[in-house]
Every structure is written in structure tokens, then in C-alpha cells.
Regions:
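N-terminal secretory signal peptides
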Residues: 1-11, 21-38
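Immediate post-signal peptide segment of exported/extracytoplasmic ligand-binding proteins
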Residues: 38-54, 78, 174-176
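An alpha-beta-alpha
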Residues: 54-62, 70-75, 163-213
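Residue-level recognition of beta-strand->loop/alpha-helix junctions
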Residues: 58, 86-90, 114, 139, ...
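Short acidic/histidine-rich motifs immediately flanking catalytic phosphotransfer sites
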Residues: 103-110, 234-237
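Hydrophobic alpha-helical
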Residues: 115-130, 198, 212, 216-248
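Flexible loop/hinge segments that line or gate small-molecule binding clefts
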Residues: 119-160, 171, 178, 184
């Protein structure tokens, strides 16, 4: 693995540490309806004295969650004195790879990336790491953490989420019936975790029948086409688990 992380400018390292702490606190407080003035006070603790340039990318702005992530990054960027440039993944591994190749050809104080698929961005991300640019891996693995030396990896517990949602669905239908799981992108480590959580629960219910587990790649149009077919093929569907809100 690269050891370039040790070359990070001390001022930038301190900012990234503050960003993680203040950003996590701010996101949590925002969830409780905290006023913007308080968010600004929180951000002031980690604000950079020097204007920083950051590159961001997520799977695709067509997804509501990703669009909200962009809005959040730009909002906190203003508070932390960071200029945010966005590289849209467009819910396409090849298109995101092209965007990240472009990102890697430029200089940044740091980059934050949510990959559409694991292993699709390794080369350009490694190029940035080798150039001394700290890369924050968000939500899904860019590559296994023993294969690429990202600055940090931030993700929810997708297995737990998948299991919790599935348990609620199974309880709602009385522990028996027909269920469908519509997955996100199969190469997305978050989707993989949600599927693991799903199967860890349904295996305990012998009267549950899984009718279909096709992916729809987080895409609303693909989901609609898939479900037009599913509703024709299966006259009795008791529950459905979708890997994100938009598909549901």
C-alpha cells in the first residue's frame, strides 16, 4: 500500500480531522432540526484559514440521496472554506471512471468519492494518493482497504440495515409469504451488505419464499420496467425490499 498519506500538509491533516468531527456532529444535530446559526458555530471549530479545493463524486445525482449529499457537501464546504467541485457518476461505472480520470489529472487538497462499483476507480484514485492527495472513501468501497491506502472510509452498517428492514417486513406479513428484493448495483459494497442482511433473516423463516432478487442499479426507470414484469409474472407478492427509497 502507498505510504503517501504521511506527506499530507499538517494544516490540511488538521482540517480533515476537524472536518470529520465537526461534520459528523453537524449532520447529527441537523437531523434534530438545529438552526443554521448553530451549524455555523460548529463548523467554525474546523474551518480552514486557507481556501481549500476539494473534488467530490458520488454514484449519480439522479438518485435523491446522492443529490442531497451534493447539497450537504456544498453547504458544509461554504462553512469550512472549501471550494467543492463535483464529478457526477451518472449511475454508470464507465461514466464515473471517465469523470474520476479527469479528477485525477488535476490538483486538489483532498477528494471524497462514493464509487458506483467496487474496483472500477482503483487506478485513478491510486494516482491521486501517489500525488499526496488524501482520498476519503464514502459509502461503498473503492477497493478493499488492504489494497488501497485511502485516508479514511465512511459507511453505514449495511448488513445491519438490510437485516433490520427485512425483519420488519417479515414480521409485517406474519413470518410467511412471498417476498422480492430489488437490489441496487451488484458491484456496490453497500448493496452487497444489504443483500447479506436480507438473506441472513429470510433463511430463518422456512415459510418465506424469495421470488426475485434482480438488481435495478438505483435507477427509477429500470425499477419501473423490472416491476412491470414482476407484477405480471407473480400474482401474489406479500412484501418487497428495495435497496433505496427512490426505487421503492
Amino acid at each position: 500500500m502507498s505510504t503517501d498519506r504521511g506527506r499530507i500538509n499538517p494544516r490540511r491533516r488538521g482540517f480533515l480531522t476537524g472536518l470529520g468531527a465537526a461534520g459528523a456532529a453537524g449532520a447529527m444535530l441537523a437531523g434534530f432540526g438545529i438552526e443554521p446559526a448553530l451549524a455555523q458555530a460548529i463548523a467554525a471549530a474546523g474551518r480552514s484559514g486557507k481556501k481549500l479545493k476539494a473534488a467530490y463524486s458520488n454514484a449519480g445525482l439522479q438518485a435523491t440521496w446522492c443529490a442531497q449529499g451534493k447539497q450537504a457537501a456544498e453547504y458544509w464546504g461554504k462553512l469550512f472554506n472549501v471550494s467543492v467541485t463535483w464529478f457526477d457518476g451518472e449511475l454508470s461505472a464507465p461514466k464515473q471512471r471517465s469523470a474520476i480520470d479527469d479528477m485525477a489529472s488535476q490538483k486538489w487538497d483532498f477528494a471524497a468519492i462514493q464509487a458506483f462499483g467496487e474496483g472500477t476507480l482503483t487506478q485513478p484514485v491510486q494516482k491521486m494518493i501517489n500525488a499526496g492527495i488524501p482520498v476519503i472513501d464514502m459509502d461503498t468501497l473503492i477497493a478493499p482497504l488492504d489494497k488501497i491506502d485511502v485516508h479514511t472510509f465512511i459507511a453505514p452498517d449495511n448488513i445491519f440495515m438490510g437485516a433490520a428492514v427485512t425483519e420488519a417486513l417479515v414480521n409485517a406479513i406474519g413470518g410467511e409469504g412471498n417476498i422480492i428484493m430489488t437490489q441496487g448495483a451488484l458491484g456496490h459494497s453497500g448493496a452487497q451488505g444489504r443483500a447479506k442482511g436480507f438473506f441472513s433473516v429470510v433463511k430463518n423463516y422456512p415459510k418465506i419464499k424469495v421470488l426475485d432478487t434482480s438488481p435495478a442499479d438505483w435507477d427509477v426507470a429500470k425499477t419501473a420496467r423490472l416491476w412491470e414484469d414482476l407484477l405480471t409474472r407473480f400474482p401474489k407478492i406479500d412484501a418487497a425490499y428495495f435497496h433505496n427509497d427512490d426505487m421503492a
